[in-house]
Swiss-Prot record:
It comes from Mycobacterium tuberculosis (strain ATCC 25618 / H37Rv). This is Proline-rich antigen homolog. It is a multi-pass membrane protein. The gene is pra. Signal peptide: none annotated. Coiled coil: none annotated. Residues 1-31, 38-78 have a biased composition (Pro residues). Residues 89-233 form the RDD domain. It comes from the Bacteria. The keyword Nucleus does not apply. PANTHER family: PROLINE-RICH ANTIGEN HOMOLOG, PROLINE-RICH ANTIGEN HOMOLOG-RELATED. GO terms for cellular component: extracellular region; peptidoglycan-based cell wall; plasma membrane.
Amino acid sequence: MTEQPPPGGSYPPPPPPPGPSGGHEPPPAAPPGGSGYAPPPPPSSGSGYPPPPPPPGGGAYPPPPPSAGGYAPPPPGPAIRTMPTESYTPWITRVLAAFIDWAPYVVLVGIGWVIMLVTQTSSCVTSISEYDVGQFCVSQPSMIGQLVQWLLSVGGLAYLVWNYGYRQGTIGSSIGKSVLKFKVVSETTGQPIGFGMSVVRQLAHFIDAIICFVGFLFPLWDAKRQTLADKIMTTVCVPI
């Protein structure tokens, strides 16, 4: 018995042979007779992954999230502009701290002057005349005494720069202020003002001195107990 061909429209036609050189196969032709089979979608080029979604409105991609190990910068210290007067360091406490801070410098320079006076040399000249005999002596510092006095003076100056510049600018307190438990901070940030600004603050005390030292008395009546140098540098003294 001979086989009869299938009636038209029952089966889709066989797919065409693959194209040369590994090209993509063309989509199959539509089945005859409207059998209802839809052609498969064409394969995407490249790796076969779907394309990325379009960017959000405006055409800009959202910023990347922060790194897992990153730390946000710490907030600035609290401003202390509104503290009551009693919260600032009293004037007498600041005076006592100044005596403590300057004591090592005075001791070093004083030792240098004592050594220079003790080691000075004297030279005498005798004058003989017909009616009188006189002797004149002149004292002058020795080279060793002058050298020791100079070295101790430089050491005292280095101590002041370290104490009032580096130490006070870094932690807020010089030696005297640490003993009496208070510190110098910026009234806008509440933090120590740093080495350079601390040195400038000490130089600004010259203004307190040239007006007959009245600038040093300002903390007696000022609401924030500031000297003129404090007002210029926007610093205040507060207890630790």
